[in-house]
Design a protein with these regions (language model features):
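Active-site gating loops and adjacent loop-to-helix segments of metal-dependent hydrolytic enzymes
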Residues: 58-94, 121-129, 156-175, 226-251, ...
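Divalent metal-coordination and catalytic microenvironments
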Residues: 8, 22, 27, 51, ...
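A conserved active-site cap/scaffold subdomain adjacent to cofactor or substrate pockets
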Residues: 261-305
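Metal-coordinating catalytic core of metallo-dependent amide/deamination hydrolases
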Residues: 122-257
């Protein structure tokens, strides 16, 4: 027997609808009806989180001190390596459990975990090559978030096939061992393929990885830092996205994560191929990466929490819009001709692009996963704008993932114990 939900408004693929009844069966939306009164809350489709490194949740607030030299992404990376070398499998599960709980409480209902912390601290493989991935899957199962595992191929420390550095020893794989890792991840649930970057995979390896992915999601970091752009130019004579578009079969199943430093021609090329721009505005601001040129991009985009320094879907959207306002010296930059309400345009765009990047159905529609979020409000555009631009705390009330309620009145049932276990882990690690 289908379960039914009635809302005063719901954000459907075609826009807002009033007095909406959803029928849910076996984790999917069986029917969407309008004109059914009696609902009180506003329903939003669950937000996909298209880029996360769950273990980095343990770094939040611990890299905000200036060192003796100029601080940058690259100095932050050295601190991240120290954490990565200390993490044990149980620590990965603890960090991921808290991160996934916080994602759900903020309205993320699915996450693409860009996972590269594969091996033991000395670089040897665990008996189960997917031990760390299995911990991520366990955390997702226990919290209820929908997980796309993206095991990362990381074989080199720089362009031209440079050998990995000693502190990167937990990340490395050959194509053969990576294929075994992918097979293990596929047994754990939905999975894709993730070359770390053009620095970490040669063209021959990237070609093999694209073949391995087939039509599954393929995600790659690209053009996050100007130093990467300069190194790619020195190596190939081309910019990173330009190089990818010329040498790889970039298509709709590709997500180009960050793509911060791109030209209008590269932006047009990404859009023409159907690649999703994976934007992580809070992390990109935290690391001083730069600002994605959204005004030059006509393609799909989604949002990710990346380093998990602050996990909040609405604040990612806020940072995205405000960064564009600062760059363009205009207001309401991400609004569109068809959706002039900025928060609604941001939300709808990120849901659509994020769902494509994760290879899942997105939106409140028949056949889609029954993953949705409720907020309070009478006028839905204003309610969503307040949640994105004016809320001091998340305005999410309840969250369902595949028909299961995982957040009630803004709180996940595991929130308290997840935080206590996380704090105890930090006391050991830091």
């Amino acid at each position: 027997m289908p379960e039914t939900f009635i809302f005063s408004h719901a954000l459907l693929p075609g826009g807002w609808a009033r007095d909406v009844r959803l029928s849910v069966a076996e984790g999917r939306i069986a029917a969407v009806e309008t004109g059914i009164g009696g609902g009180r809350n506003v329903a939003l489709p669950g937000m996909p989180n298209l880029h996360s490194h769950a273990f980095q949740r343990a770094m939040a607030g611990r890299a905000e001190r200036r060192g003796a030299t100029r601080d940058s992404f690259w100095t932050w990376r050295e601190l991240m390596y120290k954490l990565a070398l200390a993490m044990q499998p149980e620590d990965m599960e603890i960090a991921a459990t808290l991160a996934f709980t916080e994602m759900l409480e903020s309205g993320f209902t699915a996450v693409a975990e860009f996972h590269y912390l594969h091996h033991a601290p000395d670089g040897t493989h665990y008996d189960d090559i997917g031990e760390m991935a299995a911990r991520l899957a366990a955390a997702a199962r226990n919290t209820g978030i929908e997980l796309l595992l993206l095991p990362v191929f990381y074989a080199h420390a720089g362009f031209g096939g440079a050998a990995l550095r000693e502190e990167q020893r937990r990340f490395g794989n050959t194509l053969e061992s990576y294929a075994r890792l992918c097979e293990r991840c596929a047994a754990l649930g939905p999975s894709g393929v993730a070359p770390h970057s053009l620095r970490a995979a040669t063209l021959a390896e990237l070609t093999a990885l694209a073949t391995l992915a087939g039509t599954r999601p393929l995600h790659i970091h690209v053009a996050e830092q100007l130093a990467e752009v300069e190194a790619c130019l020195a190596f190939s004579g081309q910019r990173p996205v330009e190089y990818l578009l010329d040498h790889a079969a970039v298509a709709e199943n590709w997500c180009l994560v960050h793509a911060t430093h791109i030209t209008p021609a590269e932006a047009a090329g990404m859009a023409a191929r159907g690649a999703v721009a994976g934007l992580c505005p809070i992390t990109e601001a935290n690391l001083g990466d730069g600002i994605f040129p959204a005004h030059d991009f006509a393609g799909a985009y989604g949002i990710g929490s990346d380093s998990n320094v602050l996990i909040d879907a609405a604040q990612e959207l806020r940072m995205l819009e405000y960064s564009q306002r600062l760059a363009a010296r205009q207001r309401n930059v991400m609004a569109t001709a068809t959706i002039p309400a900025t928060a609604t345009a941001l939300y709808a765009g990120a849901v659509a692009g994020g769902a494509r990047a994760l290879g899942i159905g997105g939106g409140i529609a028949p056949g889609a996963p029954a993953s949705f979020v409720t907020i309070a409000g009478d006028d839905p555009d204003i309610a969503l704008a307040q949640a994105v631009f004016a809320a001091r705390t998340p305005m999410v009330r309840d969250v369902w993932v595949n028909g299961r309620r995982v957040v009630r009145n803004g709180r996940h049932e595991l929130a308290r114990i997840a935080r206590a276990r996380f704090d105890a882990m930090l006391a050991r690690l830091v």
